[in-house]
């Protein structure tokens, strides 16, 4: 399906997944999730794209429940039914990774933090100066938590601590 979510963001960019392709997993959003992605594109992605004036690389966008489970994304199994808790599964989150470009992940993180409306912003691993990637979400109902976290490894497991 050829569709633009915003001027510079195509649906294909947020649904692309090597894991889904390899495992034959469908990764098409529902109409509701598509509407959520349009809000994220308008309020977060497009302002980033226009500010920096270069293509913005999305390393992870939409994830169907099956894809989220396959990659070990946030979720749990209740009575044998997998329930994803990641905002990637509702069309409300993207991960941005600008490695190999003239823009750093830190520049993206700081621009979002200081200039945009967002729900959750995560400085994903990396060094004190630069995250490995940036996770950002936009709550489709408009109720933004403005939660800033840092992902860290503790004893081999990922945990999220308040960003300072």
Region spans (language model):
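Short connector loops at helix/strand junctions that flank enzyme active sites
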Residues: 51-53, 89-93
């Amino acid at each position: 399906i050829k569709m633009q979510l915003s001027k510079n963001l195509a649906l294909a960019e947020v649904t692309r997944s090597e894991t889904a392709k390899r495992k034959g997993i469908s990764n098409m959003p529902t109409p509701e999730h598509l509407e959520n992605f349009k809000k994220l594109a308008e309020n977060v992605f497009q302002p980033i794209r226009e500010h920096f004036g270069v293509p913005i690389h999305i390393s992870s966008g939409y994830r169907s429940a099956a894809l989220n489970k396959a990659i070990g994304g946030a979720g749990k199994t209740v009575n044998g039914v997998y329930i994803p808790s990641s905002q990637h599964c509702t069309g409300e989150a993207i991960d941005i990774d600008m490695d190999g470009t003239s823009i750093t992940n830190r520049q993206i993180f700081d621009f979002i933090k200081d200039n945009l409306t967002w729900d959750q912003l995560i400085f994903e691993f990396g060094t004190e100066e630069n995250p490995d990637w940036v996770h950002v979400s936009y709550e489709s109902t408009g109720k933004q938590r403005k939660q800033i976290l840092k992902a860290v490894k503790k004893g081999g497991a990922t945990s999220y601590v308040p960003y300072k």
